[in-house]
Amino acid sequence: MAASSSVRPTPTGPQVFINFRGKDLRNGFLSFLEPAMREANINVFIDKDEVVGTDLVNLFVRIQESRVAVVIFSKDYTSSEWCLDELAEIKDCINQGGLNAIPIFYKLAPSSVLELKGGFGDTFRVLKEKYKNDPERTQKWQEALESIPKLKGLRLAEKSDRNEREFMNEMILEIQKALWQIAMKGNPKVESNSKGGFLVPARRLTIAHSDNPEKWTWSAIYDRPHKADIEIATMINTHALIKISGDFHTRKLIPGKKYEVVFIVSLDDTSLGWKNEVTLTLKVVMSDEAANVKAKKLCLDEYIGENWVDIPVGDFEAPQEKEDAKIFFSMYQLLNTERKSGLVVKGFAIRPAQ
C-alpha cells in the first residue's frame, strides 16, 4: 500500500502524560502506542521526550501541565521509586481537579495492584523497606496505589483473545473520549473574556467535511484569554470546497458600540495549498430583515509559520437597546481544487474595535 502524501501537523492541545515502568515496555508496546497516539492527533508526552540529565522536578512539571495521565501498571511497575513518585504526583493533581487519569493493567490483574498481591506487591514491599527512613514518601506511594487503580480503566490480560494492536486502539478511543469530555466541560457556546469580547469556538461553527477524519481532526486546547478548554479543528488533507461559517446574536453586546469580527487560525510550516484567495464575509441582519454585507479576499499563505493569528473579517456597530440583530460570518473557497492541509481553526471572535 502506498504511503499517504498528506502531512499531519504536530499534535497540539492538552498534554497526555504516560506513566510506566520498564525498558521492555518502552521498546515494545509503547514504541507502537506513541506514534499511534500522535497519528490520532493526541499530544502525548513520554519521559524520553525530556532532556537527558533533567531531574524528577521537570517530570512533575510535565504532569502538572497535562490534562490526562495514562498510568500503565505492569509486573515491574513497583520496582521503580521514580515511577511511584510520578504516581503520587498524578494523585495530587487529580485531587486538585486539574488532571484525569486512566489506569491501564498491562498483562496484570487489577486485583494484583489494588491488593498488592503476588510479585507486584512483593516488589513494592521490598522498595518500601528500602525507603523506611522516608515514611512520608512511601505513604504517598501507598495512597496512590490504593486510589488510582480504582478509577475506570482498561485491562489487557496475560492471555487474551485481543492482540496488542486492538488493545492499543481501545486505549486511544478512551483517551480521545477523556479529552472530548474535558473540552465539552469548558467548550462554551459563546464565551466572553475580561476585555468584553466573545469567542464562537470551532465546535460551534459549521465546517464542511469536519466529520470526516480523513479531512479534519479534532483536539482540545486550553485557551488562556477565555480561561477554558476548547476544541480546535485541524485540516489534514482536502481537495474539496472549504466553508466555515457561524452566527452570533447581538443582544450580549453594548448598544451603539463598535465591534470587529476576527477569524482565529493557525497554519504551521507544513501547511499546503493556500496561495489562492479565500473569501471572508460578515453579514449583519436586523430584525426588520434589513441586511448589510461586507466581503474581502485574501491569501492565507502569508500567515504560514505563525502561531495563532487574528484575521479581520469586518466591523459593525451594535444596534440600539430596543433593536435586534444577528451577525453571520464565514470563510470559504469554493472553486479551487488544489490539495490543502495544515489549517487549524480556533473560532471567530467578536470584540470591541480598537
Curated annotation (Swiss-Prot):
Domain of life: Eukaryota
PANTHER family with a match to the protein in the record: PROTEIN PHLOEM PROTEIN 2-LIKE A5-RELATED (PTHR32009:SF75), TMV RESISTANCE PROTEIN N-LIKE (PTHR32009)
Protein's name in the database: Protein PHLOEM PROTEIN 2-LIKE A8
Entry comment, domain topic: The TIR domain mediates NAD(+) hydrolase (NADase) activity. Self-association of TIR domains is required for NADase activity.
Span of domain TIR: 12-179
Native source organism of the sequence: Arabidopsis thaliana (Mouse-ear cress)
Active-site feature positions: 86
GO BP: signal transduction
Record keywords: Hydrolase, NAD
InterPro entries to which the protein is assigned, alphabetical: PP2-like, TIR_dom, Toll_tir_struct_dom_sf
GO molecular function: carbohydrate binding; NAD+ nucleosidase activity, cyclic ADP-ribose generating
PROSITE patterns according to UniProt: TIR
Lineage, highest ranks first: Eukaryota, Viridiplantae, Streptophyta, Embryophyta, Tracheophyta
Top-level EC class: hydrolase
Enzyme Commission numbers on file: 3.2.2.6
Catalysed transformations (reactions): NAD(+) + H2O = ADP-D-ribose + nicotinamide + H(+)
